[in-house]
């Protein structure tokens, strides 16, 4: 204990020289409590000398700040330093903090926003502007487009994706939704552009459109070539269609592009510089009508699109999203028409507006429709959204189905060739009792009834409908 006391008492009591009273820097007292490290104190640490400089406050003119200022980005800095300034506000002495809201001390993001954006998780959302995208459709299209922009080792990726299926199932519209969600502005082509009066023009057009898309990709914008209804323009629909040289050249051009996607040349020129690879998306109803070597697996990846019940319900919810129809009514409506295409429900919704249009025509007059709609100083007419109910949709849906049945049942072309009669053209109207005694007018005009037989004694020449009252004198 004595040794400990003597050690504690052995403190260097040399006077500490400050303010220039000693020579140089001196050592601070050291003890076992402070350790053996020597701490040097500057001789000018507490100088009473005052500065002769003046303090100036300057205002920066915003109009003189240029876009080329090397420090202008600091005002929008969202690094961790800026967040620390925000978090430390109110927790640190104000002496050590710069005023908030001045230049770089203004944090653009709050701490919560910064953390939430940093930890944000992205998922494959299958909605675009309120419209439903089928997950299987979106998966196939996104994977195909992405795969064509990647460099996969020792793998030959098919350039063309052929989406085919029944009519009116939303193939083209679903493609547009997926591309819009991916930020792609595609180069569009239709089946009508695959035929021309000049031999070779459609094949040249395909190469031009492909190179246009390649130029956009070269500029840093994702793009693709989208061909609508390929089978209608390049396929053979039976003996009634003629196979022309343009059909042959379109098939050959697509085959050549699929084999050499980075070396697509225009007729009459050759450029050694390679172009960007552009994925091609094709839609159609029946790809069995296309040239078989074109649709082989190495060139075209095929996808048969048949929407499930969930897909049909999801698309119909997007169609009727602004009509305040209950979800259970939409499900029932879809189940009531299981064999109809998705396009049927879009036509059904448009059919409900017929009543509003009819009221507009009656209020304006048939003679004034042209001046009101085509050459009018007034704006376009505004219609109130009609009330849509399940009962009204079912009524119009049954009417559309009846028209479809008429087309399949009557087949007037064959009837005209076989006989000089109308066949069963009016069978549906006769069965409903709406054929006799009524004309084709849209308004209820009185039809005079009476005896229409000239041989009868009570023949009425003004009668337009026979009521069965003819009297004969034998």
From Swiss-Prot:
Check the record and name the InterPro entries matching this protein: ATPase_AAA_core, P-loop_NTPase, RCA-like, RuBisCO_activase_AAA_helical
Entry keywords, A to Z? ATP-binding, Chloroplast, Nucleotide-binding, Phosphoprotein, Plastid, Transit peptide
- Outline where the chain's transit peptide begins and ends: 1-58
Q: How is it modified after translation?
A: Phosphorylated at Thr-78 by CK2.
Listed under GO cellular component are: apoplast; chloroplast; chloroplast envelope; chloroplast stroma; chloroplast thylakoid membrane; Golgi apparatus; nucleus; plant-type cell wall
- Tell me where in or outside the cell this protein is found: Plastid, Chloroplast stroma; Plastid, Chloroplast, Plastoglobule
Disulfide topology: none
A GO molecular function assigned to this protein is:
enzyme regulator activity
> Where, in this chain's numbering, is ATP bound?
165-172
**Which residues belong to the signal peptide in this entry?**
none
GO biological process entries: leaf senescence; response to cold; response to jasmonic acid; response to light stimulus
For the modification Phosphothreonine, which residues carry it? 78, 283
- Protein function: Activation of RuBisCO (ribulose-1,5-bisphosphate carboxylase/oxygenase; EC 4.1.1.39) involves the ATP-dependent carboxylation of the epsilon-amino group of lysine leading to a carbamate structure.
Q: Which family does it belong to?
A: Belongs to the RuBisCO activase family.
Please give the name of this protein.
Ribulose bisphosphate carboxylase/oxygenase activase, chloroplastic
Q: What species was this sequence derived from?
A: Arabidopsis thaliana (Mouse-ear cress)
